[in-house]
Curated annotation (Swiss-Prot):
Its main location: mitochondrion. One of its GO terms (cellular component) is mitochondrial inner membrane. It catalyses: a ubiquinone + NADH + 5 H(+)(in) = a ubiquinol + NAD(+) + 4 H(+)(out). The gene is MT-ND1. It is a multi-pass membrane protein. It is an enzyme of class 7 (translocase). Core subunit of respiratory chain NADH dehydrogenase (Complex I) which is composed of 45 different subunits. Core subunit of the mitochondrial membrane respiratory chain NADH dehydrogenase (Complex I) which catalyzes electron transfer from NADH through the respiratory chain, using ubiquinone as an electron acceptor. Essential for the catalytic activity and assembly of complex I. This is NADH-ubiquinone oxidoreductase chain 1. Pfam families: NADHdh.
């Protein structure tokens, strides 16, 4: 795998992240009956570039009592993991065609918890640490349901390879037979990426900023990029799992166009939800998962395991 292949994946992702921040501000603006950014460049299109220049040219301050090494490593790890998770995603051909691509993505999303924990702990601030603890508890909790939903979907697909899901869904989207799972998956991805109405770690309208409260300039920008890269990546994964695109081996570019449209629609849904819903209380957030989602997903998983056996067939083998 050459460095060019790597760059052709990473650079478009970072560009998409930059313009997603602009899209979010524009969408929120119009939903609140105002314009949003419209000064820098035509229709405010150069706003992300201005933001990036401002953030990366500021002096990266840090608290005097912070742990320097960990304080700097946490945002780097966050962005590195967010970009690594794009590798096994089929668009329609992945950067690295892994045999266990789904497990790799689960492992990487679990590792992302460490960057949050390190940033809160290394800041040597009680507010950052409390924010980090809340973020970690939320992320780990919702990973349980994400893993069970993934297992149920993979039982229908018959393989841990993401590319197989495209072939599985050529005739019918998995959204149709597994719509309860798809709904729970979408809500869990909102919680996993710390987005409204589950953004209790940041709580922009009440708290300061959560685990990254002590960060400024470049390191803060890295956290910001990682968060938005994760949002787009989760929507891309949702599309692969439940909204399998039209795939014609003679014209693979059609798949990519189809894929991009679906990811954009899901991302707009994320922004729409942020503009529409108030924040959950922390106990409601945990009750939703442990008392509602977990029993439901376990029951659905048992259903998808027992159905093929009851119908005297076996799960598909690849």
């Amino acid at each position: 795998m050459s460095i060019i292949n790597l760059l052709t994946t990473i650079i478009p992702v970072l560009l998409a992240v930059a313009f997603l921040t602009l899209a979010e501000r524009k969408v929120l603006g119009y939903m609140q009956l105002r314009k949003g950014p419209n000064i820098v460049g035509p229709w405010g299109l150069l706003q992300p570039i201005a933001d990036a220049v401002k953030l990366f040219t500021k002096e990266p301050l840090r608290p005097l009592t912070s742990s320097i090494m960990m304080f700097i490593m946490a945002p780097i790890l966050a962005l590195a993991l967010a970009l690594t998770m794009w590798m096994p995603l089929p668009m329609p051909y992945p950067l690295i065609n892994m045999n266990l691509g789904v497990l790799f993505m689960l492992a990487m999303s679990s590792l992302a918890v460490y960057s949050i924990l390190w940033s809160g702990w290394a800041s040597n601030s009680k507010y950052a640490l409390i924010g980090a603890n809340r973020a970690v508890a939320q992320t780990i909790s919702y990973e349980v349901t994400l893993a069970i939903i993934l297992l149920s979907v993979l039982l229908m697909s018959g393989s841990f390879t993401l590319s197989t899901l495209i072939i599985t869904q050529e005739k019918l989207w998995l959204l149709v037979p597994a719509w309860p799972l798809a709904m729970m998956w979408f809500i869990s991805t909102l919680a996993e990426t710390n987005r409204a109405p589950f953004d209790l770690t940041e709580g922009e309208s009440e708290l300061v900023s959560g685990f990254n409260v002590e960060y400024a300039a470049g390191p803060f920008a890295l956290f910001f990029l990682a968060e938005y890269a994760n949002i787009i990546m989760m929507n891309a994964l949702s599309t692969t799992l439940f909204l399998g695109g039209f795939h014609n081996s003679y014209n693979p570019s059609l798949y990519t166009t189809n894929f991009i449209m679906k990811v954009l629609i899901l991302t707009m849904a994320f922004l729409w939800i942020r503009a529409s819903y108030p924040r959950f209380r922390y106990d409601q957030l945990m009750h939703l998962l442990w008392k509602n989602f977990l029993p439901l997903t376990l029951a659905m998983c048992m259903w998808y395991i027992s159905m093929p056996i009851a119908m005297s067939s076996i799960p598909p083998q690849t």
